[in-house]
Regions:
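Positively charged n-region of N-terminal signal peptides that target proteins for export
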Residues: 1-8
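Bacterial Sec-type N-terminal signal peptides, specifically the leucine/valine-rich hydrophobic h-region
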Residues: 14-18
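Extracytoplasmic metal-acquisition and chelation regions
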Residues: 21-335
Length: 335
């Protein structure tokens, strides 16, 4: 697989160089062949920023503010494909190869990135690895009572990738992105610093609203008939949880034992809701409800932002708007 990756990348780079030799005026912005001669004006002055997922993309936009026109921002996962099943296209690799700043999560789902970075054309490119930024705050994946075990054994430690679902983490990560942008574009560093500070205040305010909702809630446990990517969020506010699968699970069918256990926990805790994440398939949650004594629990959905699309962005979706919607759902779940 790795040989195929390198062969593809080499072919793409060669094609770009040949195109540049034939007609330098037609080289696309961001191409690795667009370096100017000593007497030629630079092909572009925009900062090229590539992000993998929506939260990173939206944070970059917020930090740039009214300077967004000075940058070319790409969100690789913009068509609804889940983070855990994404595979980069040839065009994605070219964009990453020549960008000035690359922001990615850095978990198991980003296993393709290492080879891409080694082959990148822009050796001066800055890279922000979210898990590295957070350091010891990153949590190991955990299997709680009743959670279905993975069929595939993992010898190495696995870390929970879903760090963006903590508002506290978001504030730290925004600071790291702001610092990188200030280095890339020192003429506008004061603007980026001020924008990051203002956005951080919004994150802190929403964080306080979450804490207030949890403190006022009747229940302190969430139960997901689904994967569970909200570990960082529940840990921030001292909530407990049960779930069918871990956050990065590839499983989609819950066993009879898993469903029975979760239904029993709903009854024991008198929980009013069974939770799911975004997506159309809520079959496991529905089956759990049907196996409870009352069979009348509501099914509520929280958005983990793993499938946010370019169309969602065009429609005005932001990180803060989705986290605010998640707060509304959380309030209902906690009673």
């Amino acid at each position: 697989m790795k040989n195929v990756f390198f062969a593809l990348l080499a072919a793409l780079m060669l094609a770009g160089m040949l195109a540049g030799c034939m007609n330098s005026s037609e080289v696309p912005m961001g191409s690795a062949t667009a370096a100017p001669s000593q007497t030629e004006a630079p092909a572009h002055t925009k900062i090229s920023i590539v992000t993998t997922i929506f939260p990173e993309y939206d944070w970059v936009r917020e930090i740039l503010g009214d300077k967004a026109d000075s940058a070319e921002i790409t969100m690789l996962l913009d068509n609804g494909v889940d983070l855990h099943s994404y595979q980069p296209t040839a065009d994605d690799i070219i964009k990453l190869s020549d960008c000035d700043l690359f922001v990615y999560v850095g978990g198991e789902s980003d296993g393709w990135v290492e080879d891409a970075l080694k082959s990148a054309a822009n050796r001066d490119r800055k890279v922000i690895h979210l898990l590295d930024v957070l350091g010891d705050s990153v949590k190991e994946e955990e299997t709680v009572e009743g959670m279905q075990e993975e069929e595939e054994d993992h010898e190495e430690k696995e870390y929970d990738e879903h760090v963006w679902l903590s508002l506290k983490n978001a504030k730290t990560l925004v600071g790291a992105i702001s610092a990188a942008l200030q280095e890339l574009d020192p003429d506008n560093k004061d603007t980026y610093a001020a924008n990051a500070e203002a956005y951080g205040q919004k994150l802190s305010a929403l964080d306080a609203e979450y804490q207030k909702a949890v403190s006022a809630g009747t229940y302190k446990t969430l139960l997901f008939g689904d994967r569970f990517p909200f570990r960082y969020l529940v840990d921030d506010y001292g909530l407990s949880y049960y779930a069918a699968f871990v956050g990065c699970s590839a499983e989609s069918e819950a066993s009879f034992e898993t469903v029975s256990f979760l239904a029993r926990k709903v009854d024991e805790g008198k929980l009013p809701c069974v939770m799911t994440i975004e997506g159309k398939n809520h079959k496991i949650a529905e089956t759990i409800v049907q196996n409870t004594a009352g069979k009348n629990q509501k099914i509520l959905t929280m958005d983990s932002m793993q499938s946010t699309t370019a169309q969602d962005v065009a429609n005005g979706t932001t990180y803060l708007s989705l986290m605010a919607k998640n707060l509304d759902v959380l309030k209902e779940a906690l009673g």
